[in-house]
Amino acid sequence: MASNDVRPVIKLRSTAGTGHTYVTRKNRRNDPDRMRLRKYDPVIRAHVEYREER
């Protein structure tokens, strides 16, 4: 049931290799592909790209 949810919970993992993650929800109908956002990584104290992890 949860796997067919329209707004599933996803993890956004830092591409800087620090292991830092953000947890958010996304709308599958509007964003069917993997999400990529530029967000702040507090480990390296800089903005880096975060990618959706499955």
Swiss-Prot record:
InterPro entries, per the entry: Ribosomal_bL33, Ribosomal_bL33_sf, Ribosomal_zn-bd
Tagged with keyword Transmembrane: no
Keyword Ribosomal protein applies: yes
GO annotations of cellular component type: cytosolic large ribosomal subunit
A Gene Ontology molecular function term of the record: structural constituent of ribosome
A Pfam entry, by short name: Ribosomal_L33
One example of a Gene Ontology biological process annotation: translation
Keywords: Ribonucleoprotein, Ribosomal protein
Stated family: Belongs to the bacterial ribosomal protein bL33 family.
NCBIfam families, alphabetized: PRK00595.1, rpmG_bact
PANTHER family: 54S RIBOSOMAL PROTEIN L39, MITOCHONDRIAL, LARGE RIBOSOMAL SUBUNIT PROTEIN BL33M
Annotated protein name in UniProt: Large ribosomal subunit protein bL33A
Organism of this sequence: Saccharopolyspora erythraea (strain ATCC 11635 / DSM 40517 / JCM 4748 / NBRC 13426 / NCIMB 8594 / NRRL 2338)
